[in-house]
């Protein structure tokens, strides 16, 4: 597959950002997150089949850029740059926007997509227009038009101020503006998360390592895509349950992947090591049920579940450990970290995380989920996306990282799993795993 870049430009907000909003102060929780770009690719079929493909591409290209400019007026920090550890310069420099053409039809690509080919659709950093400090850009976008007129929208969003829900809210606003381009669209009002968790310059610069430890690229790793359909999830949840509890989709899938990853590591390394699983818990619904989608920034905390030789590795046992740790991050847990006095509690909990990660002989796995966040509800006027994926980047640093997404139907789960090469060789042939999921299934075949 060949991808040819046609143009590169900056899309600026259609209305200038007021002087009093030129500096966006990030929250205390944002301070804990590295400014890494997280890419997601949305694939849309060409639904305008009665119109010549060149005309479809020209029209789509124009309206996407115009509606993006309108949307950025409300999401003004996204058109700026990360200034320093505690602020974003909302300078209206604009979103770096690339347009390209793909030599294939989209259906050909989706028949058997692979991570390396998908990464060709991400915004490249080689252009002179893309400065050397590319990680300082808050958002970069590439629109890749296939031979059939279908389009892949690749959006790289800086995790520094954008978590999964913030990202999806932005995309929905852009899509809604595109659908009603001739109308006056009102984007959601955003309450900055800094008002909930005030920033503090005294936070140690190495605090990021307490949230994301030992996940750096220290060896060769590979990524595989795993699909659980609805019926398999029903069976898996039943197997992972006990007389005292019934797991959620996230708990059952995470527990199974964790169990099989532990087994794969034991087989490839010839020894049984302690295992630590970190997971994220979204705060929004717990603190602001009515406006939870409209709070911008990182509003989550990392929890930790641990397993060792003496704790057992049965599926229902691992799932119960995970459930118990998730339940600890409740409304009281969150409220203690809010306000002016929350800084001390955050520092205290960072130390607890550091202690959980002290065992350098343990295997660490990081789980993150955007299930139930509405990733397939982003409709630009062409219907639901044919497929949504997170391909990572060519210079991704993370290993032992697992992302969970909804399938297009909403009742399945797609898992993107990155493991050490030797562990993956064992993991992908685990019969217990294969009883519930399939590897590298074509998105065209997924419900």
Residues of each region from the PLM?
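Detector for long, low-complexity, acidic/polar
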Residues: 24-25, 29
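Short, surface-exposed beta-strand/loop micro-motifs that present aromatic residues
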Residues: 30-31, 138-144, 398-406
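Soluble acyl-CoA-dependent acyltransferase catalytic core bearing the H(X)4D motif
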Residues: 2, 6-21, 34-35, 39-372
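Low-complexity, glycine/alanine/valine/leucine- and proline-rich hydrophobic stretches
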Residues: 357-447
């Amino acid at each position: 597959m060949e991808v040819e870049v046609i143009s590169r430009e900056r899309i600026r907000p259609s209305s200038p950002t007021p002087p009093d909003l030129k500096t966006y102060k990030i929250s205390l929780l944002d301070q804990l997150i590295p400014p890494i770009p997280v890419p997601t690719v949305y694939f849309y079929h060409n639904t305008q089949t009665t119109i010549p493909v060149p005309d479809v591409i020209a029209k789509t290209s124009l309206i996407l850029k115009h509606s993006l400019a309108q949307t950025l007026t409300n999401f003004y920090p996204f058109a700026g740059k990360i200034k320093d550890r505690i602020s974003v310069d909302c300078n209206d420099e604009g979103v770096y926007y690339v347009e390209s053409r793909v030599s294939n039809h989209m259906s050909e690509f989706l028949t058997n997509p692979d991570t390396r080919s998908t990464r060709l659709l991400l915004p490249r950093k080689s252009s002179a227009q893309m400065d050397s400090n590319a990680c300082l850009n808050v958002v970069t976008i590439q629109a890749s038009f296939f031979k059939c007129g279908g389009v892949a929208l690749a959006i790289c969003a800086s995790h520094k101020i954008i978590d999964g829900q913030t990202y999806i809210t932005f995309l929905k606003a852009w899509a809604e503006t595109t659908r009603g381009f001739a109308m006056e669209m009102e984007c959601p009002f955003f309450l900055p998360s800094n008002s909930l968790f005030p920033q503090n310059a005294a936070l140690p610069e190495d605090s990021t390592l307490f949230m994301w430890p030992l996940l750096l690229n220290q060896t060769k790793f590979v990524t595989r895509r795993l699909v659980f359909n609805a019926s398999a999830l029903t069976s898996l949840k039943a197997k992972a349950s006990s007389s005292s509890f019934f797991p959620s989709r996230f708990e059952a899938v995470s527990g199974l992947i964790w169990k099989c990853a532990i087994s794969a590591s034991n087989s490839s390394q010839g020894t049984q090591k302690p295992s630590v699983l970190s997971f994220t818990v979204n705060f929004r619904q717990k603190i602001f049920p009515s406006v939870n989608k409209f709070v911008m920034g990182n509003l989550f905390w990392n929890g930790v579940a641990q397993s060792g030789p003496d704790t057992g590795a049965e599926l229902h046992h691992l799932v119960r450990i995970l459930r118990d740790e998730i339940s600890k991050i409740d409304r009281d847990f969150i409220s203690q970290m809010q306000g002016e006095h929350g800084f001390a509690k955050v520092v205290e909990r960072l130390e607890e995380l550091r202690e959980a990660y002290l065992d350098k002989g343990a295997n660490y796995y990081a789980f993150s989920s955007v299930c139930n966040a509405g990733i397939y509800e982003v409709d630009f006027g062409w219907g639901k996306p044919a497929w949504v994926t997170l391909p990572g980047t060519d210079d991704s640093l993370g290993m032992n990282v697992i992302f969970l997404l909804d399938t297009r139907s909403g009742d399945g789960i797609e898992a993107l799993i990155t493991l050490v090469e030797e562990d993956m060789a064992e993991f992908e042939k685990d019969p217990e795993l294969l009883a519930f999921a399939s590897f590298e299934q074509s998105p065209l075949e997924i419900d």
